[in-house]
Amino acid sequence: MRSFKSLLVALIGLTSLMYALQDLASIDEMRMQVGAAPGDGYRDTLLSGSPAAGWTGFALITLCQFVIAGVAFKGAWDLYAARNATDAEYKVAKSAAIWAGGLSLLSWFALSLMVGAGLFQGGSDFGAMAMTRAFQLGSTSALTILFVNGVRD
C-alpha cells in the first residue's frame, strides 16, 4: 500500500509538470490572449487591457505548477524511501506529499479563481478550460492526499 501511495503522489507531480510544460508550449496562445481586446472573447474586466498583468499572472501560475511538481516528486520519493520504515517515520515522510496537495488547492483557489477568473478571464470561453484544469488538479490532489494520510498503511 505504501508504494501505491508513492505512485499516486508522483502522479500529482506528473500532472502538474505536464500542465506547466503545456503552458510554456502554448505561449503563442497566451500572447494572443494578452493582446486580445475586450469583445474578442473577453469581457472588459479589471485588468483585461494590461499585458504586464497578464504576463505576470501567466508566469505566476506556471511557476506555481512547477513548484507543485517538484514538491510532489519529493513527496513521492520520501514516501517510497520510507515504505519499509516504522509508522512514525512514515508519518514524517508524508509531509512533502501533504504540502503538494495543499499547494494544488492553493493554486486552484488563489491563482485560478482569484487571478485567472477574477481579474482576467471570468465569464469568458477562454477561462473555462483553465478553470476546469485547475479544479481537476486541485480536487484529485486533495483526494490523493486524503487517501495517503487517511488510509491505514
Set out the residue ranges of the language-model regions.
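Extended, low-polarity transmembrane helix blocks
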Residues: M1-Q22, W55-L63, V67-D153
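Membrane-interface interhelical connector segments
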Residues: I27-A53
